Amino acid sequence: MKEPDDQDTDGEKSVTSKSDGKKSLRSSKSESRSPVQEDNTFLEDDTDETFTKGEGSYLEEDSDEERLEGSLSSFQYGDLQSTTVPQQTPAPAVEEAEEEVKKKISESFFYDYMELASMPFVTLDSNIPLDLLTLVHSFGYDCRKRANLQLLDDSIAIYIAGNQLIFLNLKTKEQIYLRSSSGEGIGVIGVHPHKTYFTVAEKGSFPDIIIYEYPSLRPYRVLRDGTEKGYAYVDFNYSGNLLASVGSNPDYTLTIWNWKEEQPILRTKAFSQEVFKVTFNPDKEEQLTTSGSGHIKFWEMAFTFTGLKLQGSLGRFGKTITTDIEGYMELPDGKVLSGSEWGNMLLWEGGLIKVELCRGTSKSCHNGPINQIMLYEGEVITVGSDGYVRIWDFETIDTADVIDETGLLEIEPINELQVDKNVNLFSMIKMNETGNNFWLAQDANGAIWKLDLSFSNITQDPECLFSFHSGAIEAVAVSPLTYLMATTALDCSVRIYDFASKTPLAQMKFKQGGTALVWVPRMVNFTGAQIIVGFEDGVVRILELYDPKGLTIFAGRKKILDADIQLKQVFKPHTACVTALAYERDGEILATGSKDQTVFFFEVERDYKPIGYINTPGPVCQLMWSPMSHPESTLLIICENGYILEAPLPTIKQEEDDHDVVSYEIKDMCIKCFHFSSVKSKILRLIEIEKRERQRELKEKIREERRNKLAAEMGEDGEKEFQEEEEEKEEEEEEEEPLPEIFIPSTPSPILCGFYSEPGKFWVSLGGYDSGFLYHCEFPPCDESSDFKEQKDEPIDVRYLADTEDNPIQTITFNINKVMMFCGMKNGAIRVYVLNQNDPSLTSLVDYWHFNMHDNNYGCIKSIANSFDDRFLVTAGADGNIFVFNIFSEFMLRKDMKAKVPSPRFGIETEPIPEDIEDPKAYSIENARRKREHDKLMKEVGEIKARKREQIKALRSEFCNLLEMNEKLPKHMQFKRTDFDVDSQIRAEMHRKTAFKIQQVEKELAWEKEKHELGLMKLKNRFRDPLESDTIVVHAILSDHKISSYRLVQPSKYSKFKRASQSERKPSKLDRFEKEGPGRKDSQRDAGGSVTIQEESIIEKGKKFRPKTLSEIIVENQIEKTRKLILKAERAQLKIQQRKKEWEELYKSKPGDDYEDPKDLQAIKEAQVYMGDFNLKTAPDYKIPEHMRINAAKKEEELGHLDSLVHGNKRHMNKCILSLRDLKVAVVEEIQCLVQELKNIQSTLHISKHIPIPKIPQIHPEEVPEKRFQYDEETLLNFKQQQMKSKDEKSPGVEQTGSGGPVGGFLKLSSRKDGDLTTRDSISRSSKASTFSLDIPKCLEFEKAEPTDVELEIMKRDEIKHVYMQQYLVNRIKELVVTFDAELRLLRHQKLKLDTQMKLSDLHHVTLFQEILLLKNFEKQENILQERVNSLDKEEQYMQWKINETLKEMEEKKNEITKLQEQEKALYAGFQAAIGENNKFANFLMKVLKKKIKRVKKKEVEGDADEDEESEESSEEESSLESDEDESESEDEVFDDSICPTNCDVALFELALHLREKRLDIEEALVEEKKIVDNLKKEYDTLSKKVKIVATNLNAAEEALEAYQREKQQRLNELLVVIPLKLHQIEYVVFGEIPSDLSGTLVFSNHALRRLQERIHELQEENSKQQKLNKEWRERRKQLIREKREMTKTIHKMEETVRQLMISKFGRVVNLEALQTLSVNTTLEELKIRKLRKELANAKEMKMWEEKIAQMRWELMMKTKEHTRKLYQMNDLCIEKKKLDSRLNTLQNQQGNAFQGPREADVVAREEVTELIQLQAERISALKEEIALLRRKGSLILPPIQSPREKEIQPADL
């Protein structure tokens, strides 16, 4: 065994962790999480390599809301590690948080493999070495595990085997092992895209993902807390910096990792059901896809406002049935192609199924699920469970779309490869072998294949590199002599291995799977060469192993293997699967157990003879004979349902006693039974009682010590204190919890295994509830009267097994000296107990060694065995793995160890191989005997029935004799037929029963009838309906000539669709570019401009519908008037410019004196190159013209055209032959009529004058093949009779005769019937002609007298007429026959010519097909080259267009510069003219004009006219303020241009300033235009360089394409083409004779030869034509020179006339262009319009303010009125107040005299008066405030103020 970082381990070291990887129950998470030990020097040396310790589980901290949210916040890029702060300077929490620093993992950091790898668990102080068992080799392969085959390089493959990762060298077949870290299994593995790392995703509680470096195999990174129980799939992205993982049940967590930093980026729940796979999109790494049970989901990593999220979109199946998706593939454009359970491909787009892809005739793409889909080199590869690898066209799939309501699209694969029969491909990986297309395939049926997918003529056949068992290993057995082992499984195979040399030797396949296996002991077969195997159909086979090298060697024999297996004997003792096999200790008896609840015994001799069987109360799971130490030989039978039986040796009967026995059942055997009753609850109860008793004793001891201590210290006081404390404790103590209840499971726990301990005693291991213990049981005495099912027995002793409550022992075996007990556990672990010698009670069952090897979930150990010398241990698990271990020994194993295969027995090659039992429904031994007895009984019953039938037959003959005697009697003495009926009702009942039976038979046969009708219809649809016309053979009448039609099949819809699709080819990218052209952008810009114009027009239309005011109408009229004037001037200027442009173009188009037409030059060049040259396709420098280049599509179109042409010709010929057949039928009918007439005529003539009647032609069956499918009842009856006659005949000749009988008979019958019909027709047709001949004999019948002379004359005349008619009819018949034969010969001649053409067409078809195959091989590379040429051509055209655009823009800019320069000159000229000649300030004004000043750049401000005006004014002010004075030409002169000099014209000064601004504008525009021109020149230079580079690349690409075309043409030239030639067509002769070798000849077509001959005449005609044209053009040139002279004179005259008219009208010569373009002053007109608008706006505003003043006056008047009303109210209130004051004074004076009442009334009155005074005071103050408000102007008038008292009084008053 090889492991990375393998180190010596100390055997005496105590290990406290189990193999599941938990280190002392993970007590220290910081230790388990920290990849390195805490070491100060480590931190000092590598500060980057720091990790966080004490980190908790990430999934435990997640809340349920975060999981349902669908995504989690991303982690920080590194772990946070809090730094400690000294206690002297405590800092606040904020500062502590800021001191946490992100730490990154160093790229050079690695973990220690020995710290990560799980180790065996050994009990403390047991002195058991850790390397008690050492893995030597693995012979198994978990082939049904997804993605369990990966490649690290060309020779190293890795796969999972339980808790090991195996590195398999494909060349040397060596294995290296890597242990899991958790010890609970490995979930899945993955490989980095660069093959530098691989990942191992484990299983267990919160398992890790460990990433190892390759090839060092050192642990590089550990990813934690990605799932709860295990990983289902992992995948790296294309760049390899991210890793995606998905968990298994129960959480199915999808996690995206930044694996180099060991941090999860995103996490969410993938789905609620099982997820099979997750992958990144290789083209868009932010997209992922997951698939699984009944779903597919599309994910995207998207940035949201809360951060990076995983957003998933579930695929909706719609009308398609929901399916599990195993394989899928992401397409480059985002679509996804997935498989399905029924084998079709589903194309997904936008989360929906776009189309379902199937094969032609609605066949599925694969027969079964598609397990993998890949995209490789532009082709789609699908891997199916049917064992096929199919290649599909990517373009067809990518552009697929629905064409009908079914949603299906039929496509066909390009290539396909069937690996082998019974192959279930699960996955494939590309092998990185340069120059080869080899793949490594995982076969779920137990193999690793090497596939060659190159699909060429040198493609290698699929090679099976390794073969394994598929599925669970059911049994394993080891040879008693050597290092050989045998295994069997449900994959129907038995395999032999040499585990010493680590080599598989032989295998043998069967129809059923093996379930039990035992190596025959030496006492039965001394050489140890026999194996006995039990199968699931109840068959037991004895196989013999031998070394074929010891056989006699024959010539021509295949490769001799190291071992071979041969079937020796086979028998079937059971009807269900055989579960156990056991040989008696002396080897005399074989016992077999089965699930059919029987145990069968065989006597072991030369052949195994059945003894008998016994019934068991349950399915048998194990058989074991007692060892030699027991006094008697007994069989221990263990049943699954809790029964254990002990059977003695059966009695062997003699053959003569056995002959008359009806059954093999043994009924008199004394069998002991033990029915296990659950005692685990009792054991747990006893344990709890003992635990409480120990606790009670401990408390009592502590109490006694306490009392003694207090008594010694304090005496009697201490005793009292102790009693008080005890009383308090007794009060505080609560009642004890109840003991565990006794529980017995309703379903008995299954018994897994057992073994003898002593005679009558045994140990058993149970599963289910009773697991966790090993039970020692004893059989009760044998009692035949008792019922097993009512029996309940308990074990006598138990042994506790640590950590087996949920993990029971599945199988047990011992070494030779019984000191080690090897246990195979349910979770795939191996446990070894070290025992004392002679310890049947297992008292030393304490110390053990425990190690997880097989898969913990489904890797239950099915069988475990040790070698004959206890040096090796073999385990076989349900996970398909077979491990071989070296048991700890002082002796080292030799590397050259090898097992010895037994030599073959003498005469083994001559022995006949026994007939195997392959039928699973075959009778067992017991059933065969019972069947034999039943057949014997049925034979006796048949003999009795036969005797009864003879008696009935005699009675029937006697009754028939009585009937005959009755018929011989006279009628009056005869009995009536009814008198013989004993009972009339019997006959009626018989008729009723007969009718009922007929009805019943019709009902019973209704299904058969419908079945046969459907079968006939399907046969017609399959074989008859596709035929367009069958073969018809028309025979000539007089000769043996015949002509046959073509058997035509209707053209398929696929071929029609294919031709249509080929004819409608897509345009190339270059064509599309040429169609679109470079002006597309301009058109888009124009379109955009039109849109804006359209929007503006819509706005203008909206304005038109509004009512216009008078001011708007005035302004619009003024604007329209100005616009018309400007438009007129612009039109004139445009016309002048257009005329100038036309003249410029005309002068530019004038060719130079040395100009030559490029077309002429090209034609001359081609003529010089190709003159007198006829290019051959075989020439090495042959250049294929563009129109003659071919590809596969063109060839397929040509092939389709050829097929349609051939089909049309054949169809036309078939129509002609069918017409000829109809002509023959018509001729035969007419001849039949004529023959009938001839017979009628000859009946009146004398026989001497008869002419031989011509034979009527017959219609052959070949001429009417359609009548073969017409039948009637008579035909069917004949067919039935012939079938009955030929029922027992087996010869092929007889079968052919019988099958052809009904057809031939039917055709004769049909022809006879047709003949009768035609005869009747002929009689009816010739009835009129033959009436006269029929009347004469009738007259002769009545008149016997001699005829008279007249009558004789009439008879003579009639005779002459009839003789003539006879000859005429005969000639007519001959004419018809000869004419028909002539027509047939003519048509036959045409048919022969057509046959020749059809043969040539077939040859041409073969040639075209060969060319298509060749062209398809070239098509891929040619498309790549053509695409490159197209792209470069497109790029060159685009750049050329860009250059042209740049040149055009440069020309425009140069024109703009010229115009600006002309404007500047015009400006100076105009200013000079305005100054005049003798102006003394001319120099000053010119300096002002030419002065250079700095200006602020004007900003474009959008707004109305006022804002524009303000901006212009401000810019002028700023420019005048910020302008600096420059030095003039004279440095001494300094002048101020801001002040106009005295005596200088102010208008000229202002004009100078104004023109200076214009000059500056022009200069700025010139600078900008020159900059643009410079930039355009640079761009032009850059583009020119790029064009040259692109042109160079284009030329190189075209040359490469041309070279590839030549290579393709050369390969096409190598194809052999058949051309039939006649001798006169061969003109290649040597010395007057045709040479024998014609390889150097050239086949030249007549068409090409005629074309060359015609070309001579064409060139002669062209020459004469060109001479004639030359002469005409010379004459034309002379004429043009004369016209030019005349036109020059006319121009001079017209110029003089124009000059004179200008002088007469203007007084001088003026510039007409300036006159025509004279326009209005736009600035002045704009100012006028703005002024008008401003006046109108001011008037409108004045009107608005006047209306507002009137409104305010009205409001002032209303306020004044209100104020006056308030003053009147205040006056009234003052008067009232005065009155009240006076009245109050009067009441106060009369207070003492007025009232003499009680004191209480005075108090109330006083209070009321006080309240009234307060109220009035409040009212007065309120009125004062209101008066003050009313006196102010513009104050807010409030409603009258009321006091609170008034508010209370008013409702009362109301």
UniProtKB/Swiss-Prot annotation:
Gene Ontology biological process terms, A to Z: cell morphogenesis; microtubule cytoskeleton organization; nucleus organization; sperm axoneme assembly
PANTHER family in alphabetical order: CILIA- AND FLAGELLA-ASSOCIATED PROTEIN 43-RELATED, CILIA- AND FLAGELLA-ASSOCIATED PROTEIN 44
Tissue expression pattern: Testis-specific.
Subcellular location: Cell projection, Cilium, Flagellum; Cytoplasm, Cytoskeleton, Flagellum axoneme
The protein's name: Cilia- and flagella-associated protein 44
Keywords linked to the UniProt accession: Cell projection, Cilium, Coiled coil, Cytoplasm, Cytoskeleton, Flagellum, Phosphoprotein, Repeat, WD repeat
Acidic residues bias: start-end ranges: 58-67, 714-739, 1503-1536
Recorded family membership: Belongs to the CFAP44 family.
